[in-house]
């Protein structure tokens, strides 16, 4: 799953700043949020995440920083419900669930993923 993605991608921006992007970890985290919190079937979640990740091959610093700025939960909700899902007149809650950090730690450990998906150097 997510063979097009890999971890430990070093990216240097135009201004010379560098980061390490764990794109495979990020893809699996999106998949995990969609299947765990939204109860999407794995096939549906995999298809949506793979399509999204295809748009950042090869990944840029803008992709990595943008993903880290909004967070995995928010990005998964965008993938599921689209832009504006957090507006008050929608039924979707934009807040991370109370158990999100604990879930993240368990999920990354269970699946042999990096602890986070971005490292600023």
What are these regions (language model features)?
Residues 1-121:
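C-terminal alpha-helical interaction appendages
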């Amino acid at each position: 799953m997510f063979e097009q993605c890999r971890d430990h991608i070093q990216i240097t921006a135009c201004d010379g700043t560098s980061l390490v992007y764990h794109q495979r970890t990020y893809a699996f985290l999106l998949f995990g949020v969609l299947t765990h919190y939204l109860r999407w079937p794995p096939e549906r979640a995999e298809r949506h995440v793979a399509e999204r990740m295809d748009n950042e091959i090869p990944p840029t610093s803008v992709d990595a920083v943008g993903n880290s700025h909004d967070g995995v939960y928010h990005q998964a909700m965008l993938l599921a419900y689209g832009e504006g899902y957090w507006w008050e007149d929608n039924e979707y809650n934009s807040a991370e669930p109370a158990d999100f950090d604990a879930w993240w730690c368990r999920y990354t450990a269970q699946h042999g993923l990096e602890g986070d998906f971005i490292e600023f150097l």
